[in-house]
């Protein structure tokens, strides 16, 4: 059972975006917050077909509207490579954010739609 105060988080990123209806590779960034600083735990690859799904896979539970909203593949946003380096993620494999509302607010997003 996980609680809202759990130090573990899952963030979804799109690794290789395709048009709606195509399969897209998705990576879930698992990180732990220690003393206010996020520490990268690892990447877990998942695959979604048709439309991109917002948020990590989880049993149905009450969630804020911003997290339950589905996002189309062409509505994704790029993550600032400088911020990716804070997680020791390689900017050359830069990920696209699946769920803008679900990302940690401390990450700096560029307001550029990918499409």
Swiss-Prot record:
Could you tell me the keywords of this UniProt record? Apoptosis, Nucleus
Task: Report one GO cellular component.
Answer: nucleus
One Gene Ontology term from the biological process aspect of the record: negative regulation of apoptotic process
Claim: Nucleus is one of the keywords in the record? yes
Q: Which tissues express it?
A: Not detectable in normal kidney and liver. Up-regulated in chronic and acute allograft rejection: expressed in the inflammatory infiltrate and in tubular epithelial cells.
* Chaperone keyword on record: no
Name-wise, this protein is Putative TGFB1-induced anti-apoptotic factor 1
This chain's source organism reads Homo sapiens (Human)
């Amino acid at each position: 059972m996980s609680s809202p105060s759990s130090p573990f988080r899952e963030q979804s990123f799109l690794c290789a975006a395709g048009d709606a209806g195509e399969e897209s590779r998705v990576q879930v960034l698992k990180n732990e917050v220690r003393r206010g600083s996020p520490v990268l735990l690892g990447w877990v690859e998942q695959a979604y077909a048709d439309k991109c799904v917002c948020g990590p896979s989880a049993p149905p539970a009450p969630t804020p509207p911003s997290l339950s909203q589905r996002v189309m593949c062409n509505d994704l946003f790029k993550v600032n490579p400088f911020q990716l380096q804070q997680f020791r993620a390689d900017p050359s494999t830069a990920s696209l954010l699946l769920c803008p509302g679900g990302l940690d607010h401390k990450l700096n997003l560029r307001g550029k739609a990918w499409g």
